[in-house]
């Protein structure tokens, strides 16, 4: 539908006649709106909605389709009335762009995040009307609906037509040419940073209010205390920062751990959101909570009975049920539960003469079963991005597996009544709506993911996975690529990624017919309960290392086609840390690949941005708990290093600074260990650029082939 410019994050308007998207075609990242003809399936017109100097992203339609909420990284000292704030930000952007001095001054931590310096900016939420004039820069020109840019004095358009009718506007941002209004002023990220998934902000159904997540603690670098805040969309004439802040309400202040991803119920009574309970611990269990907007009470919907992390979730249109995804043993099933009954203290009198027998049974059932999870029978794979459509009769979701990227599927849901035995009548087989990758996948041979279990550390059952090479011959012996996941609170599973893709690692290379890929979900992995996750806290090289070695032992003993004399180990992030730990604690591998791994735990604490992570995992700071840091630091085993190692690191990795990679490579070279370093000056914690990804795969596979493949 959009082929003449880049387009990202498409979002349909409530009426289905338009959609918004983000594009870098003009003025950097901006919000665009396209008119859509449903009959022909084509875009009939499109225009740029925003013209904000600090750029725009993350658009979200209001329920009535009249406004769009979006994010922009702005200078908090510019907080003022909408017009003045916009002009102030534009001036600062111009000054920074044109200045020959690039020095920065930091007065607090978290001055950089993931792969970028914050440059004194904070993320704020803005709202802008969709209809009429599409400006949001007073004094910088205004866009007509056709996208022409008026000069600051409105005397002529960019097309040069002197006397063209200028859009009206005023200092306060009222009228048909209203500038975008900042709904989250202050020196905070509001909303907080998100790596994807559900937004950390939402509109109320009546469009009068928004809810968003923000951390207002004095030092966010050591805090996970994201709270949920609500604020009216309009707070008064002028919408000054003082007015907005006075009308803003913190609804989760009692919880000192993280709250995020708010989502209003369609009837407007509740806000559902995810929450953790332990402050400072980013890998605590994500629970699904409900905030009652009338009583201001908060409820744990499943009362702690689900020992899994709640992923994405969505409301049924009648607000009676919530659908959610949960990671479980390498898969992500879809589940649902009822909202009502004794969860909110509601009691239904079954003897009420006005109730029919079916109504009495329905009420009784909800009282008893509100917390029971029911499964939507979608076998295997990872299911996510849940949406209910068709007046509650269809469930849309994305599904992927290790051998196929995401596609959109739909499942029929017929719910005429609520019955104890089968409250929802769920269609048995989803219908695949998109097949965007079929033509490519038909040309590629891939193997299914095989699961195995073995006794790991502490006698606990641990799950592993295996992928055979294409055109597998059981009579042959195959070398091994032993992949170690990051996190450490992450997991391997039946999902797809172009980064660290097990199918690509299993594929034939110039040196042979392919590799057996083995992956272990060691203690600390997600999808096996919170106790299993917590086991790695303060024990980075302990049970996890034991699980990995025992898992590989098990595979060697039970899969005779594995050549145990030709094994390699590869890991990134925590997997890179474990690769570094392995170099100093075993010589069983012919070669190692360490990508963005922690090498010196003490210096890594000072280099990282999210200090809460290191201080939780190593139980404090290096100067307060030096013994713990040194116990698990790979660099202290450097005299044992012998295994040929490829080091990979990106200059823009601020989670694990590039100095960790340089330190490792220097140590390997000084120890006389065969080693090589692949350095990306333009990548962060992940290698994301397609051409860089090709270089990454070739370099990694060539390294393994050199030491293992032949």
Where do the model's predicted regions map?
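Active-site-proximal cap/loop segments of hydrolase catalytic domains
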Residues: 483, 508, 519-710
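Short loop/turn segments that connect beta-strands within beta-propeller blades
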Residues: 35-40, 130-133, 233-235, 293-296, ...
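Residue-level detector of Asp-centered blade-edge/turn motifs that repeat once per structural unit
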Residues: 14-15, 63-64, 205-206, 266-267, ...
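A flexible loop/linker signature enriched in serine peptidases of the S9 family
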Residues: 1-9, 20-32, 51-57, 71-124, ...
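Intrinsic, low-complexity polybasic segments
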Residues: 136-165, 174, 235-239, 341-353, ...
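Hydrophobic beta-strand positions that form the internal "hydrophobic ladder"
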Residues: 16-20, 68, 210, 268-271, ...
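Cap/lid segment of the alpha/beta-hydrolase catalytic domain
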Residues: 424-430, 434-565, 572, 604-606, ...
